[in-house]
UniProtKB/Swiss-Prot annotation:
The keyword Metal-binding applies. One of its GO terms (cellular component) is cytosol. The gene is fur. It is found in: Cytoplasm. This is Ferric uptake regulation protein. GO terms for biological process: negative regulation of DNA-templated transcription; negative regulation of siderophore biosynthetic process. PANTHER family: FERRIC UPTAKE REGULATION PROTEIN (PTHR33202:SF2), ZINC UPTAKE REGULATION PROTEIN (PTHR33202). Keywords: Cytoplasm, DNA-binding, Iron, Metal-binding, Repressor, Transcription, Transcription regulation, Zinc. CDD domains: Fur_like. The keyword Translocase does not apply. It comes from Shigella flexneri.
Length: 148
């Protein structure tokens, strides 16, 4: 818990119970790409009485402070993940919402080459690749990966 207190203070945020609980949930292995609604449901399951409006407000504060990264994947629903030190890209299944993080040096190099060719010095980029799960029929378990 002390690390979370320090992280909040370092980001310029007061340490409050809702912020600590939301940060705790975001650190769970199954919550790498979670929507505000799914995070709220998880808090309810934990017996926490934190309102949905508070969850949205805290996530926006975390986004502004650089604690989380907001992704707007296909379908219009924002999902959040803890900001990571290493860059990664995403594969997203359009059927079940499953999100796979990956890194590929050759893709990164090629993007840099393309930017240089057009006279652009890259400072940041996002790569989202959309498709359908190749193994099995993920539509049977449509909501298994939502927000993750």
């Amino acid at each position: 818990m002390t690390d979370n207190n320090t992280a909040l203070k370092k980001a310029g945020l007061r340490v409050t119970l809702p912020r600590l609980k939301i940060l705790e949930v975001l650190q769970e292995p199954d919550n790498h790409h979670v929507s505000a609604e799914d995070l709220y449901k998880r808090l309810i399951d934990m017996g926490e009485e934190i309102g949905l409006a508070t969850v949205y407000r805290v996530l926006n504060q975390f986004d502004d402070a650089g604690i989380v990264t907001r992704h707007n994947f296909e379908g219009g629903k924002s999902v959040f993940e803890l900001t990571q030190q290493h860059h990664h890209d995403h594969l997203i299944c359009l059927d079940c919402g499953k999100v796979i993080e990956f890194s590929d040096d050759s893709i990164e190099a090629r993007q840099g080459e393309i930017a240089a060719k057009h006279g652009i010095r890259l400072t940041n980029h996002s790569l989202y690749l959309y498709g359908h799960c190749a193994e099995g029929d993920c539509r049977e378990d449509e909501h298994a990966h939502e927000g993750k």
